[in-house]
């Protein structure tokens, strides 16, 4: 369960004939408007993120600091029919609001997560669109980028320990893959993209599901010719994960 946060402000707005709302961190942002969630509003200060995702993320240069704007998009076959609309179940159940609040809860627990700045949704009858704005982590590379080069052995151990920390807090990450694990120049690991994530009672089934998804991601990135290397590297990660889990850290 995500606790109430007194620093959150929910501001309703109208966009044309549509109604929506913006949930934001009043300590980081003094004013908000719908344009913050539209790449064209930023003009030359918005740059598309080239790696991962579905062409739905931009780096933006803002007065409150560099940030990442991500619009929620569907994947798979359903995206051919409905790219970016979701069934309306109430504002508090929109994907952007849920992710914003989950990230703030994870930060309150001391976990390495970028700071969410604002979340937005616009209603379209029984459907809605959504977007989220968060702090940009500077000087980081994704695990996907690292494995295409020469990733250091210590990275695998650090990543394994980081995942164990999140799992011990009950985070079931819906899309744990190599694009969503970041490392900075000091070796610090970060986890991103908490869409559809949830806090649960720690259990073997969903923890193993997360780890299996990460392994599939690594195999996909490095290809069939690197299968043995992928399994060797992942075994290092897994040993560090298991050791951290057994020690309760």
Curated annotation (Swiss-Prot):
Active site, per annotation: 175
Single GO term (MF): ATP binding
Pfam families per record: Kdo
Main location, first listed in the record: membrane
HAMAP family: KDO_kinase
Function: Catalyzes the ATP-dependent phosphorylation of the 3-deoxy-D-manno-octulosonic acid (Kdo) residue in Kdo-lipid IV(A) at the 4-OH position.
Protein family: Belongs to the protein kinase superfamily. KdkA/RfaP family.
Protein name as annotated: 3-deoxy-D-manno-octulosonic acid kinase
Organism name: Xylella fastidiosa (strain 9a5c)
Upper classification of the organism: Bacteria, Pseudomonadati, Pseudomonadota, Gammaproteobacteria, Lysobacterales
Gene name per UniProt: kdkA
């Amino acid at each position: 369960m995500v606790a109430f946060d007194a620093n959150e402000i929910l501001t309703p707005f109208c966009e044309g004939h549509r109604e929506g709302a913006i949930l934001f961190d009043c300590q980081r942002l003094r004013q908000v408007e719908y344009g913050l969630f539209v790449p064209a509003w930023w003009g030359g200060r918005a740059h598309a993120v080239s790696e991962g995702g579905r062409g739905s993320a931009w780096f933006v240069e803002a007065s409150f600091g560099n940030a990442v704007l991500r619009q929620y998009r569907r994947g798979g076959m359903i995206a051919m029919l409905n790219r970016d609309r979701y069934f309306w179940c109430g504002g508090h159940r929109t994907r952007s609001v849920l992710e914003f609040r989950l990230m703030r809860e994870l930060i309150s627990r001391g976990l390495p997560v970028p700071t969410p700045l604002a979340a937005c949704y616009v209603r379209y009858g029984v459907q809605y669109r959504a977007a989220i704005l968060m702090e940009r982590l500077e000087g980081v590379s994704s695990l996907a980028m690292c494995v295409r080069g020469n990733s250091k052995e210590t990275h695998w151990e650090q990543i394994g320990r980081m995942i164990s920390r999140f799992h011990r807090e009950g985070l079931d990450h819906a899309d744990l893959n190599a694009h969503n694990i970041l490392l900075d120049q000091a070796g610090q690991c970060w986890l991103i993209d908490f869409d559809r994530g949830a806090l649960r009672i720690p259990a073997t089934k969903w923890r193993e599901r997360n780890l299996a998804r990460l392994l599939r991601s690594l195999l996909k990135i490095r290809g069939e010719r690197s299968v043995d290397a992928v399994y060797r590297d992942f075994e290092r990660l897994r040993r560090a994960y298991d050791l951290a889990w057994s020690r309760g850290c």
